[in-house]
């Protein structure tokens, strides 16, 4: 029972990304608009489990490290909303900004609690142990839904009712990244013994091309980019362990992938949909034939940013001025706080990525941090809002907590 609860707690980090797969596994079909109550119930339930479990652990066990600043981050966000509501009459709980504020409470606050707990009690084993279970559950759901995807007449058709082509591609790429990281890192710490057996090793190798193919079949462009970035980053980090074997493995994986997709028109069309932003050898992140609404939003954002380029329009009032989030983290940051906020954001992100790299170089048992941080880094370039993205907050808070420890360790070396 304890292990099941721990799995549910870790799933809180990615529940927004995988909920459509969980619904499909239990046979629930829902409309994304009409079924919003079901989604809200699921998210609130996982948030409650996560916060309740962390509080219980904190009360019953003595922490190895003392740190409180992440809780002040939560208080600052709450304070900023109510402060802006005093100056901007449209910033209310009933407004679009208010809804995003509530989503911050449901999505971000629980994982901030969890990241702080993991650091304070040295419990990264929670992530290492449960990440591959989540990967297997999601892969199973994706494989079971391949017939539905292949019979779809439009890339907009989803699975489980709510998972569209973007969700399918992103989730498949995320599963691929978790799987490849476990294989190449050769990490055995904190993992269940059954998953270290030769049988599961063969299964994991077999799943890699399947996960990559489903990512392409989904037709999501961001997911395709996540797949490529994950492959490149994981190969770069872990090829030093055994470059020859890694190179041969990579070649075989690519050959298997190319051979399979070459026999199906559906995979070919998915491939074309996934990479149709590749124009003239460059990636166009702004103009997108299939994303007219997002292109219009981004064109609108340039005007809004130009109205207040230095200090922006406010963390929450910026959402009111823009009417929506921009599906791009840098545009959202510029609208909220202008160049000043963007500078602070860059400084923080530089520290996050530098700490992540140092952790991966020195702690093989924490290898699972790599796929967890690549996912939101790619996703937030194309979709979603960073303030309500649980993966973004979890990775940012956790790596910042570890930053001082690993900076000092590198200096001693």
Where are these regions (language model features)?
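Aromatic-anchored transmembrane helix interface
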Residues: 39-46, 67-82, 91-117, 129-139
């Amino acid at each position: 029972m304890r292990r099941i609860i721990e799995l549910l707690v870790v799933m809180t980090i990615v529940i927004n990304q995988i909920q459509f797969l969980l619904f499909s596994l239990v046979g629930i079909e829902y409309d994304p608009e009409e079924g919003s109550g079901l989604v809200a119930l699921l998210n609130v339930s996982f948030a409650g489990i996560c916060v309740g479990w962390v509080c219980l652990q904190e009360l019953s066990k003595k922490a190895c490290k003392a740190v409180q600043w992440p809780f002040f981050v939560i208080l600052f966000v709450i304070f900023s909303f109510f402060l802006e509501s005093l100056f901007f009459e449209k910033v209310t709980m009933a407004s679009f900004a208010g809804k995003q504020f509530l989503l911050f409470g449901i999505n971000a606050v629980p994982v901030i609690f969890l990241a702080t707990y993991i650091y304070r009690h040295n419990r990264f084993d929670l992530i290492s142990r449960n990440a591959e279970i989540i990967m297997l559950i999601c892969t199973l759901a994706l494989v079971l839904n391949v017939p539905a995807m292949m019979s779809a007449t439009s890339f907009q058709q989803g699975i489980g009712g709510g998972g569209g082509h973007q969700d399918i591609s992103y989730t498949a790429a995320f599963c691929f990244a978790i799987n490849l990281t476990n294989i190449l890192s050769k990490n055995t710490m904190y993992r269940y013994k059954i998953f270290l057996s030769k049988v599961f090793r063969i299964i994991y190798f077999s799943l890699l091309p399947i996960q990559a193919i489903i990512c392409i079949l989904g037709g999501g462009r961001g997911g395709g980019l996540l797949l490529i970035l994950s492959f490149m980053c994981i190969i770069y980090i872990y090829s030093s362990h055994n470059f020859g074997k890694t190179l041969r493995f990579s070649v075989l994986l690519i050959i298997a992938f190319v051979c399979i997709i070459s026999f199906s028109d559906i995979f070919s069309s998915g491939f074309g949909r996934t990479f149709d932003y590749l124009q003239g050898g460059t990636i166009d992140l702004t103009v997108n034939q299939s994303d007219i609404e997002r292109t219009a939003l981004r064109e609108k954002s340039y005007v809004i940013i130009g109205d207040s380029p230095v200090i922006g329009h406010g963390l929450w009032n910026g959402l009111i001025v823009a009417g929506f989030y921009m599906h791009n983290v840098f545009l959202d940051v510029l609208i909220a706080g202008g160049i000043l906020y963007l500078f602070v954001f860059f400084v923080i992100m530089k520290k996050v990525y530098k700490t992540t790299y140092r952790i991966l170089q020195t702690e093989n048992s924490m290898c699972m941090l790599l796929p967890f941080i690549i996912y939101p880094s790619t996703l937030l370039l194309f979709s979603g809002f960073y303030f309500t993205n649980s993966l973004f907050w979890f990775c940012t808070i956790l790596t910042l907590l570890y930053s001082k420890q690993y900076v000092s360790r590198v200096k001693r070396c």
